[in-house]
Amino acid sequence: MIGKEVTLQDIVLELNELQPEVQPVDLFCEEELPSEQQETEEELPERTAYKVVTPCGCCKVKLRIFVNATQFAIRTFQNLLFEELQLLCPECRGNCKHGGS
């Protein structure tokens, strides 16, 4: 650039002169993306049937329930049964008030 005013010739640069190895990329390449249905099928975690045996929270009679759950869900359910959740048998359920003691 010579002088006080900038000319277009001073600004326009040829890309090939600066980096001859740079080539334009075709964004419509031959790559095939999976359909949305295939993606959702792959993302679903595997479920397994489990038999859960736990004592009633009041009378301690053995209760059995059957669930279909993921590994994460059955571990979470197990932790709840050990810590904060108690299942009740039909007889004890009648003796308790809903939502309270």
Curated annotation (Swiss-Prot):
A motif (LXCXE motif) lies at residues 27-31. The keyword Hydrolase does not apply. GO terms for biological process: DNA-templated transcription; symbiont-mediated perturbation of host cell cycle G1/S transition checkpoint; symbiont-mediated suppression of host innate immune response; symbiont-mediated suppression of host type I interferon-mediated signaling pathway. A motif (Nuclear export signal) lies at residues 74-82. It is found in: Host cytoplasm; Host nucleus. Keywords: Activator, DNA-binding, Early protein, G1/S host cell cycle checkpoint dysregulation by virus, Host cytoplasm, Host nucleus, Host-virus interaction, Inhibition of host innate immune response by virus, Inhibition of host interferon signaling pathway by virus, Interferon antiviral system evasion, Metal-binding, Modulation of host cell cycle by virus, Oncogene, Transcription, Transcription regulation, Viral immunoevasion, Zinc, Zinc-finger. Highly phosphorylated. It comes from the Viruses. InterPro entries: Papilloma_E7 (IPR000148). Residues 1-44 are annotated as: E7 terminal domain. One of its GO terms (cellular component) is host cell nucleus. A zinc finger (unnamed) spans 56-92. Pfam families: E7. GO terms for molecular function: DNA binding; DNA-binding transcription factor activity; protein domain specific binding; zinc ion binding. Its main location: host cell. The E7 terminal domain is an intrinsically disordered domain, whose flexibility and conformational transitions confer target adaptability to the oncoprotein. It allows adaptation to a variety of protein targets and exposes the PEST degradation sequence that regulates its turnover in the cell. Plays a role in viral genome replication by driving entry of quiescent cells into the cell cycle. Stimulation of progression from G1 to S phase allows the virus to efficiently use the cellular DNA replicating machinery to achieve viral genome replication. E7 protein has both transforming and trans-activating activities. Induces the disassembly of the E2F1 transcription factor from RB1, with subsequent transcriptional activation of E2F1-regulated S-phase genes. Interferes with host histone deacetylation mediated by HDAC1 and HDAC2, leading to transcription activation. Homodimer. Homooligomer. Interacts with host RB1; this interaction induces dissociation of RB1-E2F1 complex thereby disrupting RB1 activity. Interacts with host EP300; this interaction represses EP300 transcriptional activity. Interacts with protein E2; this interaction inhibits E7 oncogenic activity. Interacts with host TMEM173/STING; this interaction impairs the ability of TMEM173/STING to sense cytosolic DNA and promote the production of type I interferon (IFN-alpha and IFN-beta). Belongs to the papillomaviridae E7 protein family. This is Protein E7. The gene is E7.
